């Protein structure tokens, strides 16, 4: 049996841009993607701390060091610039993998700068 487990999380990311007319996705600073081990076109789940919205889209990289968290297309309707998000990826794992798995959590501060990286 496989279980869908948290693989990585960007915690308290601040939305910096929202572009309704872009074709879709979530732009994320490439340095944050590297820190969280997230990849271009990977599916992500987003949880808006400000309004409770929960939605999914996929990752596109933004310039490294830019601090960009950009919601594009329909996702732009789910948050406003300045809203706080939790951005997660999940992976299917068998029980043996679950027993040793430790999700990676990247805690963000002002300007979407990395405050700490933890494995639980």
From Swiss-Prot:
Cofactor binding note of this UniProt entry: Binds 1 pyruvoyl group covalently per subunit.
Pfam families (alphabetical): Asp_decarbox (PF02261)
A GO cellular component entry from the record: cytosol
Gene3D superfamilies given in the database record: 2.40.40.20
Keyword presence, DNA-binding:
no
Residue numbers of Pyruvic acid (Ser) PTMs: 25
As cofactor, the record names: pyruvate
Q: In the UniProt record, does the keyword Lyase occur?
A: yes
Biological process, per Gene Ontology: alanine biosynthetic process; pantothenate biosynthetic process
Pathways per UniProt: Cofactor biosynthesis; (R)-pantothenate biosynthesis; beta-alanine from L-aspartate: step 1/1
Q: Which GO terms describe its molecular function?
A: aspartate 1-decarboxylase activity
E.C. number: 4.1.1.11
> What does UniProt say on post-translational modification here?
Is synthesized initially as an inactive proenzyme, which is activated by self-cleavage at a specific serine bond to produce a beta-subunit with a hydroxyl group at its C-terminus and an alpha-subunit with a pyruvoyl group at its N-terminus.
Record-annotated active site: 25, 58
Entry keywords, A to Z = Autocatalytic cleavage, Cytoplasm, Decarboxylase, Lyase, Pantothenate biosynthesis, Pyruvate, Schiff base, Zymogen
**Record-listed substrate binding positions:** 57, 73-75
Reactions catalysed, semicolon-separated, are: L-aspartate + H(+) = beta-alanine + CO2
The protein's superkingdom reads Bacteria
Q: What class of enzyme is it?
A: lyase
Please give the function described in this protein's UniProt entry: Catalyzes the pyruvoyl-dependent decarboxylation of aspartate to produce beta-alanine.
Subunit structure comment from the entry: Heterooctamer of four alpha and four beta subunits.
HAMAP family listed in its UniProt record: PanD (MF_00446)
Q: What family name appears in the similarity comment?
A: Belongs to the PanD family.
What is the name of the protein in this document? Aspartate 1-decarboxylase
């Amino acid at each position: 049996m496989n279980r869908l487990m948290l693989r990585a999380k960007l915690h308290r990311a601040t939305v910096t841009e929202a572009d309704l007319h872009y074709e879709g996705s979530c732009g994320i600073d490439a340095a944050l993607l590297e820190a969280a081990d997230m990849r271009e076109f990977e599916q992500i789940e987003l949880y808006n701390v400000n309004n409770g919205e929960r939605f999914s889209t996929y990752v596109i990289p933004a310039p490294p060091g830019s601090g960009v968290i950009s919601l594009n297309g329909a996702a732009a309707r789910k948050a406003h610039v300045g809203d706080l998000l939790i951005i997660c990826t999940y992976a299917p794992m068998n029980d043996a993998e679950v027993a040793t798995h430790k999700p990676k959590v990247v805690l963000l501060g002002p300007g979407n700068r990395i405050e700490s990286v933890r494995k639980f």
